[in-house]
């Protein structure tokens, strides 16, 4: 009888411990996600701000003709040069693809590697990538994507030169730009590696980057967390196919 009582007590104690563990896990998980969401909302805002500042200088901005042809746009704000030198991830950013009537929720990516000879001495640099066709975008949705590998990459033209825009379109699937110390220009980023930050994508959306940016995934703005909407909304102000 006593052994039975002891056994029951042990079972009850174990059940109590498991209940407490589950309670703490239930509380900790939403808190962790809220922190991630806040960080990604800030990242989306920085990307949107950088893009806005670039486009607000028409004579030195991305040509409208190219912007309107882009299938997806990536912005990596405030990338630290030192991160590339030591081989670590240089920075984080967001990618949205064009969808009917606007742009998709931003998926989160890392950027690193490559040759950045023109940026020696720069503390922080904003990078903008235009994916000019679905083939280039599909390459991005792999686990790791190297610019200049399967998809050709070229320094994008700036300003109002339509002729330059047309010529570049014939040569590259991806156009790359950089802004450092207020100077915005095309920069060829061959060898740069971009990979999805799926820990953050899952924390914010519950799915990975390739699902977020899939052409078959139907999103509405109401399904997108409010904090990260600023990036697709900013892109829509400058380019929306009607």
Residue ranges and their predicted role:
Residues 15-23:
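Bacterial N-terminal signal peptides
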Residues 26-30:
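Sec/Tat signal peptide C-region and signal peptidase I cleavage site
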Residues 31-242:
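Small-residue-enriched, tightly packed secondary-structure blocks
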């Amino acid at each position: 009888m006593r052994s039975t009582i002891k056994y029951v007590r042990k079972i009850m104690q174990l059940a109590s411990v498991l209940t407490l563990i589950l309670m703490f896990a239930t509380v900790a998980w939403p808190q962790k996600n809220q922190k991630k969401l806040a960080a990604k909302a800030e990242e989306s805002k920085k990307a949107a701000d950088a893009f806005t500042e670039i486009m607000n200088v028409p004579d030195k901005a991305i040509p409208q003709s190219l912007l309107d042809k882009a299938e997806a746009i990536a912005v990596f704000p405030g990338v630290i040069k030192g991160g590339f030198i030591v081989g670590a991830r240089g920075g984080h950013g967001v990618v949205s693809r064009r969808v009917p009537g606007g742009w998709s929720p931003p998926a989160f990516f890392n950027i690193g590697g490559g040759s950045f000879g023109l940026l020696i001495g720069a503390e922080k640099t904003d990078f903008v990538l235009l994916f000019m066709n679905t083939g280039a975008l599909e390459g991005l949705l792999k686990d790791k994507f190297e610019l200049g590998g399967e998809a050709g990459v070229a320094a994008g033209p700036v300003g109002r030169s339509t002729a330059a825009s047309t010529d570049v379109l014939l040569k590259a699937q991806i156009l790359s730009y950089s802004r450092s110390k207020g100077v915005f220009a095309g920069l060829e980023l061959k060898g740069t590696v971009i990979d999805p930050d799926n820990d953050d994508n899952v924390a914010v959306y519950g799915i990975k980057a390739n699902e977020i940016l899939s052409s078959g995934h139907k999103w509405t703005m109401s399904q997108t967390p409010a904090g990260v909407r600023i990036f697709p909304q900013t892109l829509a102000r400058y380019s929306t196919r009607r």
